Amino acid sequence: MISELEKKILKSLNENARKSFREVAKEVGTSTTAKYNNVKKMEKRGLLQGYVPAVDEELLGFTLTAIIAMRISQGKLYNVYDKIIKYPEVREIYDLTGEWDAILVCFFKKRRDLDNFLKTKLNLPHIERVMTHVVLNVIKDEKRAFIEAL
């Protein structure tokens, strides 16, 4: 679990990760040194894993998002994961229960790129079946940490 002070620090950073140590310390009611030490402890524990910008993929030219479900031969999940984890188009991989073994979230610039990805990069041994969904609209895409429920 996390302390109340850590929770306050995380909420503050979640609103704006570019805040200075001094700003966050003032906001959460602690000294700059205490805030710094708490952040370092959270990083060491793996609770804070980095600081990355939230980027709009469409502004980078990635206008096509595909959700790809895969059925993989029994016992071969990690053989497939070891390959697809390296593909830059694959932004997220979810290991599932149920009819499908994995879901990929992928970004592409053009339909042709998606077509090529499906026909070449996902043409792997042990991938038995693939079902692709093209995203029409993104209703919610929350990039901030899930802290509000703590």
Task: Name each model feature, range by range.
Residues M1-L150:
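A compositional/biophysical signature of low hydrophobicity enriched in polar/charged and small residues
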